[in-house]
Amino acid sequence: MGENNWRLSFKDKAYDYFNRTIELLRGSKEMREMMLLSYYYGAEMSFLMNDSRIDEALKVGFEREKQIKRLKEVPQISEDYVDGQYSYLYAKLAYIYCMEKKYEKAEQYYQKYLSKKESHTPDGKMYSVPYLALSGQYEKVIDNCRGFKELMRTQQDTLNEQYLTVLRQEVKAYLGMHKYKEAAEIRETILTITDSINTRDRNN
């Protein structure tokens, strides 16, 4: 509900929903509710970042970090789940601090992100792409995108918005490196895939 309202630009309603839901879940010892609370912290943090409400996003991010620490103490919750939660959060915090031009703090959180196993998987590498792009580390952006594209190709899953998002990140990185030919080639691929998606949707 909160996410739908936010996407429909009913932002006051969206944040009210997030806050009420978080209050209901806060303090729960039930495993699913604890996991759900972490999810809602993450969703609200992302929306606050998109709305340039950076101080509030940081506050929510730190609350999520505390919640992940609580999840770590639950025996039924796997280490991999907790690792992934930390990985995603630390990549976001690195990006926020880079936006705020607090580069040393950003790098500290990037290193925390790299300390997690998830950060070295194709999926996890994509978490850091916004930070790497903002900090001008374009080669790493391209490397991370390449690995994720290979994963999607092996799954024969390239006709979707997620794949297009990865390609757009590559375009930005190549433009940042002034490699205009490579950027143009990927833009052609984006157009081809977009046409294929539109054709498929029409046929369905």
Each language-model region and where it sits:
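"A position-specific structural signal for the A-helix of alpha-solenoid helical repeats
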Residues: 7, 36, 42-43, 85, ...
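Amphipathic alpha-helical segments of tetratricopeptide repeats
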Residues: 19-29, 62-76, 107-116, 146-154, ...
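Helix-start (N-cap) detector for alpha-helical repeat units in TPR-like alpha-solenoids
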Residues: 87, 121-122
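Residue signature of alpha-solenoid helical repeat architecture, marking inter-repeat boundaries
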Residues: 32-35, 77-84, 119, 161
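Solenoidal tandem-repeat scaffolds enriched in leucines and small polar residues
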Residues: 5-14, 18-74, 85
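Hydrophobic positions within repeat-based interaction scaffolds
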Residues: 12-15, 55-58, 72, 81-84, ...
